[in-house]
Amino acid sequence: MSSSGEERGVVVAESEPPRGNRSRFAFACAILASMTSIILGYDIGVMSGAAIFIKDDLKLSDVQLEILMGILNIYSLIGSGAAGRTSDWIGRRYTIVLAGFFFFCGALLMGFATNYPFIMVGRFVAGIGVGYAMMIAPVYTTEVAPASSRGFLSSFPEIFINIGILLGYVSNYFFAKLPEHIGWRFMLGIGAVPSVFLAIGVLAMPESPRWLVMQGRLGDAFKVLDKTSNTKEEAISRLNDIKRAVGIPDDMTDDVIVVPNKKSAGKGVWKDLLVRPTPSVRHILIACLGIHFSQQASGIDAVVLYSPTIFSRAGLKSKNDQLLATVAVGVVKTLFIVVGTCLVDRFGRRALLLTSMGGMFFSLTALGTSLTVIDRNPGQTLKWAIGLAVTTVMTFVATFSLGAGPVTWVYASEIFPVRLRAQGASLGVMLNRLMSGIIGMTFLSLSKGLTIGGAFLLFAGVAVAAWVFFFTFLPETRGVPLEEIESLFGSYSANKKNNVMSKGKQVVDEQ
């Protein structure tokens, strides 16, 4: 038995002076991992403007355009579905590399596309990369971050999605000045650039300590934990918690061990998730799927993907004005996502989710009402209705970004037990991308069938149902170690009790 192993076998009683803020290393890891989310954000943002020019250049129908806008999210189901098993097989780090590779190839294919089938092939390849990226970034960050800053760091993927969206909007505005048949190809092709930086950045990242423990590499896991914990005691405590969660006895402390009854390769995981889940795992799965469904079904991608169309229907007639207003949406969304990220560990997950969804409901109701009034008064310039429509688009993305945007990824990636986390998180991401694809591929048809105002009133109804679901089903997880979160789920009375306990624990930790 190694001496380092003996040192990790028990938590020593003597407290060690803090060795500087080691969370800076976790911060850097979260930044690098979350860069994968830029690729999805850029695609969402750039397609909102590029679609205007692609439709004219390739002579597409509305149905073809809808499919083109939303199909990437359907294709991403392949990547999301495979990401859980892949990340358990090759590790979280190299799964991030794989995501970047697929999107790099897809972006180049889209940039060089000469017809509709060609560009669809590019979106297929890029979609697989997006699926991998959306699952692995929050899981990796959650597993690296200490409990005290897990919410803040785990919400980074949403920040980078918004940075990507903003970059896409800005790209639209500048490349729109090029000839039509060239501009949209530059808009899409330049999306390959972030993937290159991602591949370089991954070389500086450590592997997830929880994945290393599942492989029996305790020595390597401790080195990562030691770099991301404020004290050596904290690192030892985190390692012991992970070992217990994986099922490794306390007396197994060598740097490399054979994990007893190893199930992390996938055996029994899907059975434990879907066929015979415990009450707590069933509750966790419902919470994960529910929060992902609610995030997308409340209409965020309808606004982000079709902002120019919405502003056109609201009364902004020139393409330049529509794209400028769309850039403003990106700026507001990015600013408020930063605010939400800073608040998630201070006020907790539930408070931000409930506040966010309530604000989204009021914004959607006002937006739907104003667009309905504008539609029913053709030929008239109703400045108050136009102003209300533009303003409520901004308030909708702002309130979304305060809670539903960042907290969804934080919450869904932290609640699963370590053995089920990769596959459980991948199910949530698959549903998220499926709903995003459905919204993207049906919004134009929905706005014709219900009117554009009616479509947003429908989204407002979803927001009400989501608020009730959040209030009823989601316990608070702020400040609770990952290995203890499962105990919060399973029964409502236990949830309420543990919510109070977790809040008290957080206060003690902060003191």
UniProtKB/Swiss-Prot annotation:
Q: Name one GO molecular function term.
A: carbohydrate:proton symporter activity
TM helices/strands, residue ranges: 25-45, 63-83, 94-114, 117-137, 156-176, 186-206, 284-304, 324-344, 351-371, 384-404, 424-444, 454-474
Location of this chain's protein in the cell = Membrane
PROSITE patterns noted in UniProt: MFS, SUGAR_TRANSPORT_1, SUGAR_TRANSPORT_2
The protein's matches in CDD domains, at most eight in alphabetical order, are given as: MFS_PLT (cd17437)
Report the principal subcellular site. Answer: membrane
The source's superkingdom equals Eukaryota
- InterPro entries linked to this entry: MFS_dom (IPR020846), MFS_sugar_transport-like (IPR005828), MFS_trans_sf (IPR036259), PLT1-6 (IPR044776), STP/PLT_plant (IPR045262), Sugar/inositol_transpt (IPR003663), Sugar_transporter_CS (IPR005829)
In the bilayer, the protein is annotated as:
Multi-pass membrane protein
GO CC terms: plasma membrane
Q: Which Pfam families match?
A: Sugar_tr (PF00083)
Annotated keywords: Membrane, Sugar transport, Symport, Transmembrane, Transmembrane helix, Transport
**Which SUPFAM superfamilies does this entry report, sorted A to Z?**
MFS general substrate transporter
Cited function: Plasma membrane sugar-proton symporter.
UniProt family annotation: Belongs to the major facilitator superfamily. Sugar transporter (TC 2.A.1.1) family.
- The name of this protein is Putative polyol transporter 2
Q: Organism source for this protein?
A: Arabidopsis thaliana (Mouse-ear cress)
Taxonomic lineage of the native organism: Eukaryota, Viridiplantae, Streptophyta, Embryophyta, Tracheophyta
